[in-house]
Amino acid sequence: LKLVRNEATLGMPKVSILMPAYNAERYIGTAIESVLSQSYDDWELIIVDDASDDNTGAICERYASKDKRIKTLRHTENKGISIGKNEALRHASGDYIAFCDDDDIMASKTLEDNLYLVEENNAQIARWSYKTVKISSENVVIGEIPRICRNNIYHNREEIFRDYENVHEVLSCDWTGLYDRKFLNRHNIKFNEKYRYGGEDTEFNILTLQYVERMVMSSEIY
């Protein structure tokens, strides 16, 4: 797989990965390491620390000091997850937007595989399957809940809504998608800042469905 950059965008990252963070010292290092492990390395990671009162900020700064692709922003007061995501969107410079929450783990080929899908199919969004992992206080896996969508390519909104049951499988999470940044900007798609502690990504994804023309979906769990 070889993805070729347009000369006009050389020097800019292909993908901006946005990570809101709050009091995540226990697991944010694992989330950042999963980004660093990506087989495709033309990315930037923008972390917005929403005034954490634990060691989250220090952990993020330590990673940023070692890798120039990692950028950190810090709020002086807690503003909620939607404001943090919108701020990260404003600072993003990549052709595509991906999300990784502070307790997520990105499979190593998430970016490589889904960049291929979105560009090969001239799509505005790629979406993939995922699983939720339950972990005990001793960091022991105690359960897994997979959410699987079928492979499909949608060429217009009518096709998407006819197959809404499949689309709905992964609609509640922004971190199961790769989004064309120009598409988001053209339609002024951003997060509703009334959501402070969750639910913002479902509304965000529903908003994208009002405008998207081509979308590709993968049954692969990332």
Model feature map: region roles:
Residues 105-219:
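Donor-binding/catalytic cores of nucleotide-activated saccharide
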Residues 34, 41, 49-58, 77, ...:
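A conserved acidic beta->alpha catalytic loop
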Residues 13-15, 36-47, 55, 68-71:
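Short loop->beta transition adjacent to catalytic acidic/histidine clusters or analogous donor-positioning motifs
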Residues 75-92, 102-105:
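Glycine-rich, basic loop-to-helix element that forms the pyrophosphate-binding segment
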Residues 97:
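Short aromatic/hydrophobic "clamp" motif used to bind/position activated sugar donors
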Residues 27-29, 54-63, 105, 109:
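Acidic helix N-cap motif at the loop->helix transition within catalytic regions
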